[in-house]
Amino acid sequence: MTETLLKKKLNLNDQFLLNLKNYQEIFWKNPNYGDELPDLDVNRETIFQANRRLERFAPYLESVFSDTKRSKGIIESPIQRMDSIKDLLSVKGSLLIKRDDLMPVSGSIKSRGGIYEVLCFAEKIAIENGFDLKKDNYQDLRKDKYRKLFNQWRIEVASTGNLGLSVGLMASTLGFKARIHMSHDATDWKINKLLQNGVEVKIYDDNFSNAVAAARVSSQRDPYSYFIDDEGSKLLFAGYATAGERVKKQLSKMQIEVSKEHPLVVYLPAGVGGSPSGVAFGLKLQFADAVIPIFVEPTHMPSVLLGMASGLNHDISVYDIGIDGKTAADGLAVGRPSMIAGKYMKDKLFGIATVSDSDMFAYQGMLKKLENIEVEPSAAVGIRGLIQSKEISEIPDSATHMVWATGGSMVPKNTMHKYEDKAVRIFNTWKSE
């Protein structure tokens, strides 16, 4: 693709394109942002039914995952206040953090979508083989009859790490064979965790988008393979969107008002864009124009920003404009956005901020030092959106801000210590600037 043709197709001005290619921290405000939910094939009823399905599975989940006993099989994370960071950054409204780093089973936001799609497939296979939704107990799915049935199938997915963990752990627990296709960005501890749970891992010396393509071909060759498509799955999206109903209940219990006068501004890390888009969509269903979603991406991997700003969405990769894709944010290391992100977020996403790796580590150090919150580096980038919000006139002083932490509790202690030693050092320097 020539530079002239590229510029014409991208419909981006020269300075904006130059800033992207020079890895500048920028903010893109979505010119199509609006409040009306269009008529889409994933809608309010889809998400309502997804929440009810997860409730039906709760007794089973409680019986197989000890970390869900407290919540009686509901896989959800807490919300907490961050008063020390609020003071440091002089945030006018309330500051909260959504602790998806503490999500049961796989310790990340991917527990929402990945586990949900595996459960959907398990339910489908069980029903086709005599399971009665109205009469049978979901705990019966632990029986040999169903485990042998599930073991005839292999579930496959491509992942940089966290989605692979959620799909692999849920699939293997039910009795499915699981194969996780991982790009070169995947970290060793995530690979080892999967292997320890009997999950097959294929590692590609290639980027995420090409790993997805390879995984898709692998699955198509096997009639007993079920492929979970991180670039286009509506079931994954629905699983992420269940967060909206849960967050509404949590905020109500905390007596936090969400309204046009007191909007909720949510800062979500974005890689391929599926999980933040699903969460944002679910929040929009609950709060409409009283919620303002903002994504945050690495300066070296602004895939959703490039896709949405250009209008090309899934049809363009950061590599097409010469961006190198090199980032320590392994969970966000995706060069091409999902097919769903641009479509469902076209008028639902307020904007996207980009963040340098150095600032990302500073925010991780900030969370550790000031709030004693331990997350993996990519889970901390929402703070960049929070800082950017001070320059956004549409966000009033009365807003409630929510940084969405996307992963961290599964990180081995020695790995986390290495992350945090570096992060706190960078934060100490960052703070004095």
Curated annotation (Swiss-Prot):
Cofactors named for this entry: pyridoxal 5'-phosphate
Broad EC category: lyase
GO molecular function, one term: D-serine ammonia-lyase activity
Stretches assigned to coiled coil: none
InterPro entries in alphabetical order: D_Ser_am_lyase, Ser/Thr_Dehydratase, Ser/Thr_deHydtase_PyrdxlP-BS, TrpB-like_PALP, TrpB-like_PALP_sf
Catalytic reaction list: D-serine = pyruvate + NH4(+)
E.C. numbers: 4.3.1.18
Keyword presence, Amino-acid biosynthesis: no
SUPFAM superfamilies: Tryptophan synthase beta subunit-like PLP-dependent enzymes
Signal peptide coordinates: none
Zinc-finger listed as a keyword: no
Family annotation (Pfam families): PALP
BP term (GO), one: D-serine catabolic process
Alphabetized PROSITE patterns for the sequence: DEHYDRATASE_SER_THR
Database matches in PANTHER family: D-SERINE DEHYDRATASE (PTHR48078:SF9), THREONINE DEHYDRATASE, MITOCHONDRIAL-RELATED (PTHR48078)
Name listed for the protein in its UniProt record: Probable D-serine dehydratase
Protein's organism: Oenococcus oeni (strain ATCC BAA-331 / PSU-1)
Lineage of the organism: Bacteria, Bacillati, Bacillota, Bacilli, Lactobacillales
